[in-house]
Design a protein with these regions (language model features):
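Loop-helix junctions at membrane interfaces
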Residues: 1-176
């Protein structure tokens, strides 16, 4: 990971963070116990370019900015932790690595299992004072997981393969 920030890195991260906010908060579908968005697409690009830690930090910044500008519920720090961990997962699977079907599936599966099926139900149970075994929490989550896992895997592969990383690396003044 390149620890030194430069103008290119800051501007690219800012652009990707803005896209995450728009895809998550404006174009995303959100109900009380479920959220569907395509904010993972700019996270993939950020992960490929900047690695796990910077992607996690960018996801946290996007979450906080999105919450400040387009709050749909009370702020809960657990979801910000989800954003950081999700960004780190993308960075782990895609930083300086070729995007394959296997990586796309494993990354999506890891995010689905850890974020959607472990952490988010805990946060929802805490926020809404529901038992962790409640179908109010698990019903929509299982349906979303079953529907979004293949969609997200396919889009992750397509986006990951479409990004001309070698061109981006040549144009930048630092190595990714």
């Amino acid at each position: 990971m390149n620890k030194k920030l430069n103008a290119y890195m800051i501007s690219m991260m800012g652009l990707l963070i803005a896209i995450m906010v728009v895809l998550s908060r404006i174009l995303g579908l959100e109900w009380q116990f479920i959220k569907i968005s395509f904010a993972f697409v700019p996270k993939i690009v950020m992960a490929m370019m900047f690695g796990p830690i910077w992607t996690g930090i960018g996801a946290v910044i996007a979450d906080i900015i999105g919450m400040m500008l387009f709050a749909k519920a009370a702020f809960f720090p657990g979801f910000t932790l989800n954003a950081f961990i999700g960004g780190c997962i993308y960075g782990y699977f895609f930083y300086k690595k070729e995007v394959t079907w296997k990586n796309a599936f494993l990354c999506t599966l890891a995010n689905t299992l850890l974020i959607s099926f472990i952490l988010t139900p805990i946060w929802l149970a805490i926020m809404y004072n529901q038992p962790l075994t409640s179908w109010v929490i698990w019903g929509p989550r299982l349906v979303k997981g079953a529907l979004m896992l293949p969609i997200q895997t396919i889009l992750t592969y397509i986006v990951g393969r479409a990004i001309p990383m070698k061109t981006l690396m040549k144009r930048s003044r630092y190595s990714f």
